[in-house]
Swiss-Prot record:
It catalyses: uridine(2552) in 23S rRNA + S-adenosyl-L-methionine = 2'-O-methyluridine(2552) in 23S rRNA + S-adenosyl-L-homocysteine + H(+). This is Ribosomal RNA large subunit methyltransferase E. InterPro entries: RNA_methyltr_RlmE, RNA_MeTrfase_FtsJ_dom, rRNA-MeTfrase_E, SAM-dependent_MTases_sf. It comes from Pseudomonas putida (strain ATCC 47054 / DSM 6125 / CFBP 8728 / NCIMB 11950 / KT2440). Its EC number is 2.1.1.166. One of its GO terms (molecular function) is rRNA (uridine-2'-O-)-methyltransferase activity. The lineage of its organism: Bacteria, Pseudomonadati, Pseudomonadota, Gammaproteobacteria, Pseudomonadales. The keyword Signal does not apply. The gene is rlmE. Keywords: Cytoplasm, Methyltransferase, rRNA processing, S-adenosyl-L-methionine, Transferase.
Length: 207
């Protein structure tokens, strides 16, 4: 039998005792991350019926489930992740590494000539536990997501992204502020206290 490390055992204990994990199982959501988006939605009313949305870092599908329900049958949702994701009705899923150009091109092809109202990203790299390694990797994903958003958003569109405080954050924040009318930070209660993650919200893309 493989012995679990102490940190692994602690994570499992925290995971299964987590009230948001239990609530997700009860509500039929695929991950506790659904509640982060739901809390932001309750405050900011980002997602509305009929919208076109891109969901980056979508697997296992918690944010896509929430978004699909809120945009309804007249909306359009394109989701992407490096990992597999079980299908969700009316969601176009593109599997692949977002850092590769061919995956970006597939997303752009799915968007087509019509632009989107909202880009959301819960992407994070595989964490090593070493901030000097993890933060630059995370910021690289954030930069790629912002680049995509500037290509596909309609003027007035919105952008929501997971971001980690650390090197490169201030420069990135300045860049987002130059492209959106209003920029705010969100830390949902369902985000674990010890996590460095926050969510950056850009409203009103300047186009």
């Amino acid at each position: 039998m493989v012995q679990r490390s102490k940190s692994s055992a602690n994570w499992l204990r925290e995971h299964f005792n987590d009230p948001f994990v239990k609530q997700a199982q009860k509500d039929g959501y695929r991950s506790r991350a659904s509640y982060k988006l739901l809390e932001i939605q309750e405050k900011d009313r980002l997602i509305r019926p009929g919208m076109s949305v891109i969901d980056l870092g979508a697997a296992p599908g918690g944010w896509s489930q929430v978004t699909s329900r809120l945009i309804g049958g007249q909306g359009r949702l394109i989701a992407s992740d490096i990992l597999e994701m079980d299908s969700i009705a009316d969601v176009t899923f593109i599997q692949g590494d977002f850092t590769h150009d061919e995956v970006l091109q597939r997303i752009l092809e799915a968007v087509g000539d019509s632009h989107v109202d909202l880009v959301i990203s819960d992407m994070a790299p595989n964490m090593s536990g070493t901030p000097a390694v993890d933060i630059p990797r995370a910021m690289f994903l954030c930069e790629l997501a912002l680049d995509l958003a500037t290509r596909v958003l309609k003027p007035g569109g919105d952008f929501l992204i997971k971001i980690f405080q650390g090197e490169g954050f201030d420069v990135y924040l300045k860049d987002v502020r130059s492209k959106f009318d209003k920029v705010q930070m969100r830390k949902p209660s369902s985000s674990r206290d010890r996590s460095r993650e926050q969510y950056l919200l850009g409203r009103g893309f300047k186009g």
